[in-house]
Amino acid sequence: MLITLDCARFDAYNEARKPLLDAVGKARQAYSQATYTYASHASMFQGILPHVFSAEPFYNRGIRQLWRMRDKVGKKPALIEFPLDTGGIIGGFVQAGYHVAGTGAMSWFRDPKPLREAFPNFEFTGIDAKRQVSYIVKQWKRKATRPFFGFINFGEPHGPYMHDEMAGAAEVKGTTGTANFRERPHAAKLPSTQWSFDEKLWRQQVDCISYLDARMGDLFTELGRDKVGVTIAVCGDHGECFGEDGLYGHGFYHPKIMEVPMLIFRLNEDGSFTDDVNQIAERACLS
């Protein structure tokens, strides 16, 4: 299973209260392959996740990947490899006989093409994590004896940085509307005399990540009922600027846009978790 936290930057993830994910393991600071949702997911759907420079399998693709396309001779083997004619890992899982389902919050997933086209089962929800979890659980129950690959793009950490349990969520406008920086347009650079870090918006993103920890707890509880091992990658697709160097939003280069969390772990058959990459490699059956 691949779960992306849209716009979640590494420092916001670290600040969030997330008892589930913190108990699972420590997220690595990874570097996104792109500065916005479409390009980052296009990369991940080719098997290229955000990159970590430490010499750890699955985190550093130069050591070993979770999954990859068989595009070059001599590459180190991945946990699962797909032929090029599958078009990407989603088509690869379908061709391999997996029950494949996905759900996306961001508008890039609204239309059938291009990010969704390989999914036989997909629901665009907008920012609604509870609905997304419900959808994936229903798809999980439909898999019968087939292996399963699930994808979730959670949108709560993306502007307007809101979730359905946040007080005053309807009034939150985010980086494209009236926020603390007073209607500064998205991706605009302010003169240095006006630079300031918008801690209020950053903390709203922190709160959204805390909220998603609980929703992932709901998801993993349901998956665990079947006592089937599930290998899971959770990562940010890109980060966000909250006023650093006079910049807001994403879709352009800045270190805070490239720094994202990544955590790879396994939900074991007995309901426990492991983030030991060697155990994952030995025991994993990607589900």
Where on the chain are the PLM-derived regions?
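Catalytic domains that recognize anionic headgroups
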Residues: M1-S287
